[in-house]
UniProtKB/Swiss-Prot annotation:
GO terms for cellular component: membrane. It comes from the Eukaryota. Keywords: Membrane, Transmembrane, Transmembrane helix. Belongs to the shisa family. The keyword ATP-binding does not apply. It is found in: Membrane. The keyword Heme does not apply. Signal peptide: none annotated. The chain crosses the membrane at residues 48-68, 70-90. PANTHER family: PROTEIN SHISA-LIKE-2A, SHISA. It is a multi-pass membrane protein. This is Protein shisa-like-2A. InterPro entries: Shisa, Shisa_N.
Length: 190
């Protein structure tokens, strides 16, 4: 744009005479005519003159604000809808655990000594139709139980504390396996 601003009619319908840039008493760098068709001034940017009315820019600004507001409301509605659908999906699921098909239960709390940790000790389980004596295993060598006077090496006793794996089935007509103490003093082969 040039440094000469031509005369124009302002937004208040007043005629403003033309002037040249820079204006007397203004900045020396403001050598270009800037602004709009109804509002002109001097500035230092050669690309700041717009050939339409200043009020048009206000309508553009208001339109942009309305458009951004509508977009924000739509985005907010989408986020709220997604959150509600996720909540309904999660809350409508049943709160029951999955049935694995096995009915294993622990026989009771048994403490494992530090010497037995890291070896195959197994876990006792209750099996229907099996006597409690068959389910528990005393972890003691039967020969040592009968000879009370004999000194017992506790580490050696605990190393023979093994239990066979128990599996049961709810399928009608299938044989059930029961927990049976391992007669081998070294325990089952892993």
């Amino acid at each position: 744009m040039s440094g000469a601003c031509t005369s124009y009619v302002s937004a208040e319908q007043e005629v403003v005479r033309g002037f040249s840039c820079p204006r007397p008493g203004g900045e020396a760098a403001a050598v270009f005519c800037c602004g709009f068709r109804d509002h002109k001034y001097c500035c230092d940017d050669p690309h700041s003159f717009f050939p339409y009315e200043h009020s048009y820019m206000w309508w553009l600004s208001i339109g942009a604000l309305i458009g951004l507001s509508v977009a924000a409301v739509v985005l907010l509605a989408f986020i709220v809808t997604a959150c509600v659908l996720c909540y309904l999906f999660i809350s409508s699921k049943p709160h029951t655990k999955l049935d694995l098909g096995l009915s294993l239960q622990t026989a009771g709390p048994e403490e494992v000594s530090p010497d037995c940790q890291g070896v195959n000790t197994g876990m006792a389980a209750e099996v229907p139709k099996v006597s409690p004596l068959q389910q528990s295993y005393s972890c003691l060598n039967p020969q040592l139980e009968s000879n009370e006077g004999q000194a017992v090496n506790s580490k050696r006793l605990l190393h023979h504390c093994f239990m066979a794996t128990v599996t049961t089935s709810d399928i009608p007509g299938s044989p059930e396996e029961a927990s049976v103490p391992n007669p081998d003093l070294c325990g089952p082969v892993p």
